[in-house]
UniProtKB/Swiss-Prot annotation:
Cysteine-cysteine disulfides: C100-C127, C288-C303, C440-C560
Organism: Homo sapiens
Protein keywords: Blood group antigen, Cell membrane, Disulfide bond, Glycoprotein, GPI-anchor, Hydrolase, Lipoprotein, Membrane, Neurotransmitter degradation, Nucleus, Secreted, Serine esterase, Signal, Synapse
Protein encoded by which gene: ACHE
UniProt name for this protein: Acetylcholinesterase
Function: Hydrolyzes rapidly the acetylcholine neurotransmitter released into the synaptic cleft allowing to terminate the signal transduction at the neuromuscular junction. Role in neuronal apoptosis.
Length: 614
C-alpha cells in the first residue's frame, strides 16, 4: 500500500484521472454519496440527478429539465404529446432545458419590464420538460404539492423564467413545487377541428400529461400525490380553469388557484369555425394550400410541418380578425372533447361541491396591455390621451361588438363631469380593458363556483413593487403579484425593501396554507386578521398589500354588473334586432323581386291583350 501513499504526495503525478481513481479507491463514493443521496431520484422513466440551490433560509433540492414527453417535432408537430420513453443511465437535471418556440417581445429592447417575460433559454420544439423543487433534506412524510402553469396569452411563456424560481417558496413553506413547459402559439393551439393531424388544444394536453407525471412520480421527491394544488396566472389561470372543467383533468389535482385569469374570459377560447379560419389563414400566409373538411387537412398539416418553426411564429399575429389588444392568435378551442361546451356553459352546469378555489386580480389589470396597441399609449410618456383616442381605444379594447355595444361601453366608463380629461380617459380605458378581460370574468367565475358548492377565497393585489420599471401611471400591472407569491424579494441580490420581504413571506404563507388545507388563513394564529370566504351573496374579498388584511365587498360590482349582466342582454337584443332586420330585408327583397316579376308578366300580358283586340 506504500506506492499509492507516495503517489499522493507527488504533485507531478496527480493528474485529474489519477485523483478521481484515488478518490474512488479511498472511499469518496461513500462520503459523497451521503450528500448526493438527496440529489438522486428514481422516477418511472429512470434516474435523475438534481442540484442543491442556496437560499437565505437554507438549501433546497432542484431537479430541472426533466423530460416528460417525447419531443413534439417533425411528424409530431400539432399532435397530442406522447409520454417520454424510459431512459438508461442518469439524466442530468441540474439546469433548465429549452423554451418552447414562441414570439419574442421586441417592442422595448433591453427594458426590464418586457425582458423579464422573454425566453431565457434557447427556443426549440424539443421543449416538454418540467421542474421539481423540494426541501433539502427531502421530506420524510408526504408533503403538499403546488403545480405552476405560466401565463403568456397562450403565445409565450416559459417555466425557466427567473420570476418563477421555486426555491424561495419551497424553502420557506416546505412544500414541493412543480412547473412545466407547454407548447404555445400555433404549435400548441392551431386547430383544424375534426382532423386527427391538428386536433387543437395540444398545449392543454401537454399540461395534463405533466399532471399525470406528477401523480405517478411526485412521491419520489417527498410530495403527496393526494394533495396537489394547481395554480397559474393569466393564460395559466385560464388553463387551470379549463382543467377544472375537463373531467379527465379534474381527478389529477385537488385545489385550484387562478391569478388574473379565468377560462370564461373573452380572449381565452375560440369556436371551431374561427379556429379553422385562423389555421387556414396561417397556412395561406406561409404558402401552404388551403384545407377543407376532409382529406385536404392532411395535406395542409403536412405542408405546415415542413415550414421552419420561426416562419410560423413570424406570421402568427396576422391571423387575428381585427386590430385589438388582449386578443391572441392561437388559443384553446371549444372542440367537444377537452372542452365539451363553452366555458360559460360548463361553469353554469357544473357541480363544484367540495372544490376549494382561490381567485384574484391585481389593481390595474388593463394598463399593461394598453402600451401594446391602444392609440396614444406608450411606456415612455404619461399617455394622456384625447377623447378621440379613447373612443378608438374602446374599439380595439372591446373588438367584435356592435357599434351600439361599443357606445354602451363609452357611456358607462366616461366621467361625464370631465369627459375630455386626458388622465381620466387614460384610467377609464385601462379599466375597460382590465374589467372586460380579467376582473369581471374572474368575479363571474367566483360567484358561480361559490353558488354551486365550492369554497372560494378572493383577493385584489394592490402593492406596487418598489423595483417596478413600468411608469407610475400603470399602477399595479397585470402579472406583478407573481414575484411576491414566489418569494423573489427574499433573493439578496435584489433591491426590495424590508417591508416587501415580510409581505412576500405573508403571501407565500397564504398560498401554502391554501395548498395544505384549502384555507389561506393561518391555523396557528386565530388572532390574525381573517380572510373570509367569497360567497355569491356577501362577495367578500381581501386587499393584499403591505398593510394587514382588509376585508371588502363587491369585486368592482358596478362594472361587473355591466359586463356580466347588462352587456350580454344588450348584445342578445341587438342580435335579435339584427336578425329581424336581416329577415325583413330578405323578405322585402323577395317581395320586391316578386313584384318586379309580376309587373313584367303583367306588362307582357297587357301587350298580348291589346294585340288580340286589333
Amino acid at each position: 500500500m506504500r506506492p499509492p501513499q507516495c503517489l499522493l504526495h507527488t504533485p507531478s503525478l496527480a493528474s485529474p484521472l489519477l485523483l478521481l481513481l484515488l478518490w474512488l479507491l479511498g472511499g469518496g463514493v461513500g462520503a459523497e454519496g451521503r450528500e448526493d443521496a438527496e440529489l438522486l431520484v428514481t422516477v418511472r422513466g429512470g434516474r435523475l440527478r438534481g442540484i442543491r440551490l442556496k437560499t437565505p433560509g437554507g438549501p433546497v433540492s432542484a431537479f430541472l429539465g426533466i423530460p416528460f414527453a417525447e419531443p413534439p417535432m417533425g411528424p409530431r408537430r400539432f399532435l397530442p404529446p406522447e409520454p417520454k420513453q424510459p431512459w438508461s443511465g442518469v439524466v442530468d437535471a441540474t439546469t433548465f432545458q429549452s423554451v418552447c418556440y414562441q414570439y419574442v417581445d421586441t417592442l422595448y429592447p433591453g427594458f426590464e419590464g418586457t425582458e423579464m417575460w422573454n425566453p431565457n433559454r434557447e427556443l426549440s420544439e424539443d421543449c416538454l420538460y418540467l421542474n421539481v423543487w423540494t426541501p433539502y433534506p427531502r421530506p420524510t412524510s408526504p408533503t403538499p404539492v403546488l403545480v405552476w402553469i405560466y401565463g403568456g396569452g397562450f403565445y409565450s411563456g416559459a417555466s425557466s423564467l427567473d420570476v418563477y424560481d421555486g426555491r424561495f417558496l419551497v424553502q420557506a413553506e416546505r412544500t414541493v413545487l412543480v412547473s412545466m413547459n407547454y407548447r404555445v402559439g400555433a404549435f400548441g393551439f392551431l386547430a383544424l377541428p375534426g382532423s386527427r393531424e391538428a386536433p387543437g388544444n395540444v398545449g392543454l394536453l401537454d399540461q395534463r400529461l405533466a399532471l399525470q407525471w406528477v401523480q405517478e412520480n411526485v412521491a419520489a421527491f417527498g410530495g403527496d400525490p393526494t394533495s396537489v394544488t394547481l395554480f397559474g396566472e393569466s393564460a395559466g389561470a385560464a388553463s387551470v380553469g379549463m382543467h377544472l372543467l375537463s373531467p379527465p383533468s379534474r381527478g389529477l389535482f385537488h385545489r385550484a388557484v387562478l391569478q388574473s385569469g379565468a377560462p370564461n374570459g373573452p380572449w381565452a377560447t375560440v369556436g371551431m369555425g374561427e379556429a379553422r379560419r385562423r389555421a387556414t389563414q396561417l397556412a395561406h400566409l406561409v404558402g401552404c394550400p388551403p384545407g377543407g373538411t376532409g382529406g385536404n387537412d392532411t395535406e395542409l398539416v403536412a405542408c405546415l410541418r415542413t415550414r421552419p418553426a420561426q416562419v410560423l411564429v413570424n406570421h402568427e399575429w396576422h391571423v387575428l380578425p381585427q386590430e385589438s389588444v388582449f386578443r391572441f392568435s392561437f388559443v384553446p378551442v371549444v372542440d367537444g372533447d377537452f372542452l365539451s361546451d363553452t366555458p360559460e356553459a360548463l361553469i353554469n352546469a357544473g357541480d363544484f361541491h367540495g372544490l376549494q378555489v382561490l381567485v384574484g386580480v391585481v389593481k390595474d389589470e388593463g394598463s399593461y396591455f394598453l402600451v401594446y396597441g391602444a392609440p396614444g399609449f406608450s411606456k415612455d410618456n404619461e399617455s394622456l390621451i384625447s377623447r378621440a383616442e379613447f373612443l378608438a381605444g374602446v374599439r380595439v379594447g372591446v373588438p367584435q361588438v356592435s357599434d351600439l355595444a361599443a357606445e354602451a361601453v363609452v357611456l358607462h366608463y366616461t366621467d361625464w363631469l370631465h369627459p375630455e380629461d386626458p388622465a381620466r380617459l387614460r384610467e377609464a380605458l385601462s379599466d375597460v380593458v382590465g374589467d372586460h378581460n380579467v376582473v369581471c370574468p374572474v368575479a363571474q367565475l367566483a360567484g358561480r363556483l361559490a353558488a354551486q358548492g365550492a369554497r372560494v377565497y378572493a383577493y385584489v393585489f394592490e402593492h406596487r413593487a418598489s423595483t417596478l420599471s413600468w411608469p407610475l401611471w400603470m399602477g399595479v400591472p397585470h402579472g406583478y403579484e407573481i414575484e411576491f407569491i414566489f418569494g423573489i424579494p427574499l433573493d439578496p441580490s435584489r433591491n426590495y425593501t424590508a417591508e416587501e420581504k415580510i409581505f412576500a413571506q405573508r403571501l407565500m404563507r397564504y398560498w401554502a396554507n391554501f395548498a395544505r388545507t384549502g384555507d389561506p388563513n393561518e391555523p396557528r394564529d386565530p388572532k390574525a386578521p381573517q380572510w373570509p370566504p367569497y360567497t355569491a351573496g356577501a362577495q367578500q374579498y381581501v386587499s393584499l398589500d403591505l398593510r394587514p388584511l382588509e376585508v371588502r365587498r363587491g369585486l368592482r360590482a358596478q362594472a361587473c354588473a355591466f359586463w356580466n349582466r347588462f352587456l350580454p342582454k344588450l348584445l342578445s337584443a341587438t342580435d335579435t334586432l339584427d336578425e329581424a332586420e336581416r329577415q325583413w330585408k330578405a323578405e322585402f327583397h323577395r317581395w320586391s323581386s316578386y313584384m318586379v316579376h309580376w309587373k313584367n308578366q303583367f306588362d307582357h300580358y297587357s301587350k298580348q291583350d291589346r294585340c288580340s283586340d286589333l
